[in-house]
């Protein structure tokens, strides 16, 4: 019940003692009353306490070496990229944790968002996920190819923020300290260096739209997603402390680097380096190369940290299969152990799995599907075969030339 009178009896707020005549509205409960001013004050107190809890979580920011140790437990290789990410993430959250206590005369620390460049399956998304998990902050993934600028059919960039808010269980204060990973950022590059007269819906316009939220702004987000509508209730979120990590394969950027370095890449026999040596070119990438690829200067300027990831080779993929805490081989061994069965992979089988992933150009992300293909029939039959004690995966089984070897009691 809400109003200024209850049975024509003058009522007072149970919290501040003001009468119905001194406030705009009094809400009645079970023998208790609260005025609109106390409701507003309560909301402000709750908001401040939630913000303090979020900041308290960030006061002990893991040091770069500690972050690197975590990444090393889950991610194989990519040492330079992991070091760059560890430093960038530490500096970002150190900046966030000290922002609230800084004096007006202190140096204004600008946000350093991150650009990850590397081939498909090199671990870009997994690195971002692992960092967010280790910091216990909300994390959201978005695909740049699904975004369009305002006025076109597609997804508004604000919907990226909604995913983060949802990951934070609609706690906006927590979301404002989260991490957003935008994948396939190279797919919204301008087509060529010459700016078209008509805007490219999936290119420069989307970069401009992303630029606003990446550099820091108070954005209005539709709580149910989709396009904005007049008179629609919005969630307000400040993006100044959200860490944005964007990533893409940037296929062909090695050639841009070679041209800048003065190497001939056109004509038969002119490229003296092997394709495998492209990894060294990835470490030479500068903003000029990224701009030539098609990202606008303003957008590049908001991504000062560039982490280049290498193409994974057979040795790297075998290590990914076996070494990390959550390695795929360990996962499948655990699955079969629940049925009382031991699982073993021959060394040649691991090499065959890695070779298949390279041939398919899927990198680490393709390893699971190859194992699934190899073990599908086994995982179907094993629960019904109580006499089986061990399964051995061979090279021939991976190549589809024979079935895995079964040992019985």
From Swiss-Prot:
It comes from the Bacteria. CDD domains: RecA-like_ClpX. GO terms for biological process: cell division; proteolysis involved in protein catabolic process. Residues 1-54 form the ClpX-type ZB domain. GO terms for cellular component: HslUV protease complex. PROSITE patterns: CLPX_ZB (PS51902). SMART domains: AAA (SM00382), ClpB_D2-small (SM01086), zf-C4_ClpX (SM00994). InterPro entries: AAA+_ATPase, ATP-dep_Clp_protease_ClpX, ATPase_AAA_core, Clp_ATPase_C, Clp_protease_ATP-bd_su_ClpX, ClpX_bact, P-loop_NTPase, Znf_CppX_C4. Zn(2+) binds at residues 13, 16, 35, 38. ATP binds at residues 119-126. ATP-dependent specificity component of the Clp protease. It directs the protease to specific substrates. Can perform chaperone functions in the absence of ClpP. HAMAP family: ClpX. This is ATP-dependent Clp protease ATP-binding subunit ClpX.
């Amino acid at each position: 019940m809400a109003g200024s009178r209850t049975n024509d009896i003058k009522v007072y707020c149970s919290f501040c003692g003001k009468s119905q005549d001194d406030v705009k509205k009094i809400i009645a409960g079970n023998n208790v009353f609260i005025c609109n001013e106390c409701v507003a004050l309560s909301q402000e107190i709750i908001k401040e306490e939630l913000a303090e809890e979020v900041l308290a979580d960030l006061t002990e920011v893991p040091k770069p070496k500690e972050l690197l140790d975590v990444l090393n437990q889950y991610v194989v290789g990519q040492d330079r990229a992991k070091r760059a990410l560890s430093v960038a993430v530490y500096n970002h959250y150190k900046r966030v944790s000290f922002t609230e206590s800084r004096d007006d005369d202190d140096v204004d620390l600008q946000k350093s968002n991150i650009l990850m460049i590397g081939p498909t399956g090199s671990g870009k998304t997994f690195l971002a996920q692992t960092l967010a998990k280790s910091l216990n902050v909300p994390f959201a993934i978005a695909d740049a190819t699904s975004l369009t600028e305002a006025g076109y059919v597609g997804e508004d960039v604000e919907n990226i923020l909604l995913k983060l808010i949802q990951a934070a269980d609609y706690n906006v204060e927590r979301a404002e300290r989260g991490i957003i990973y935008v994948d396939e950022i190279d797919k919204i590059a301008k087509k060529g260096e010459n700016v078209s007269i008509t805007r490219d819906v999936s290119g420069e316009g989307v970069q401009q739209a992303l630029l606003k939220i990446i550099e820091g702004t108070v954005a209005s987000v539709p709580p149910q997603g989709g396009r904005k509508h007049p008179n629609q209730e919005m969630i307000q979120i400040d993006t100044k402390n959200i860490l944005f990590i964007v990533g893409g394969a940037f296929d062909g950027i090695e050639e841009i680097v070679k041209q800048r370095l003065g190497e001939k890449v056109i004509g038969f026999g002119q490229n003296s380096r092997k394709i495998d040596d492209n990894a060294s070119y990835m470490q030479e990438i500068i903003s000029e190369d990224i701009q030539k690829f098609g990202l606008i200067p303003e957008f590049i300027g908001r991504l000062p940290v560039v982490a280049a990831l290498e193409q994974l080779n057979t040795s790297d993929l075998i290590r990914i299969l076996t070494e990390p805490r959550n390695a795929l081989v360990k996962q499948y061994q655990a699955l079969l152990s629940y049925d009382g069965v031991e699982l073993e992979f021959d060394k040649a089988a691991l090499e065959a799995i890695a070779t298949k992933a390279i041939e398919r150009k899927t990198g680490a992300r393709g390893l699971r599907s190859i194992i699934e293909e190899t073990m599908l029939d086994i995982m179907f039959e094993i629960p019904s075969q109580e006499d089986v004690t061990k399964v051995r995966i061979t090279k021939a089984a991976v190549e589809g030339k024979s079935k895995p070897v079964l040992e019985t009691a």
